[in-house]
Curated annotation (Swiss-Prot):
It is found in: Secreted, Cell wall; Secreted. Keywords: Cell wall, Conidiation, Disulfide bond, Secreted, Signal, Sporulation, Virulence. Homotetramer. Further self-assembles to form highly ordered films at water-air interfaces through intermolecular interactions. This is Class II hydrophobin 1. Belongs to the cerato-ulmin hydrophobin family. Disruption phenotype: Results in reduction in aerial mycelia, conidiation, hydrophobicity and infection ability, and complete inhibition of pigmentation and primordium differentiation. It comes from Cordyceps militaris (Caterpillar fungus). PANTHER family: HYDROPHOBIN.
Amino acid sequence: MQVLLIATLVASVLAAPTEVSPQTSGGGGGGGGGGGVCRGFLYSNPICCATDILGLACLDGDTPPETPRDAKNFKEICAKNGQQARCCVLPIIDQAVLCIRPLGV
């Protein structure tokens, strides 16, 4: 039973998209929202993550302290604290489940 559960989890992770394209701010204006760095329905939560465990879990992670403009800015914001930029499915109390790198990072 446990083997079936683990196999199902691994299969679902492998079937998920591996990269998420960043959203452009649309030009003009003073910048856009940071909601575009993690696009897509599932991987929509930007997280600065200290430890990424094979994309299955992100330990000691939190939302970025400032709103990222794009994927490069997202990476820079997280790097200031020695963390990695990730787009995750489910953030829960300083951890997140199923995380990927945003496109351009």
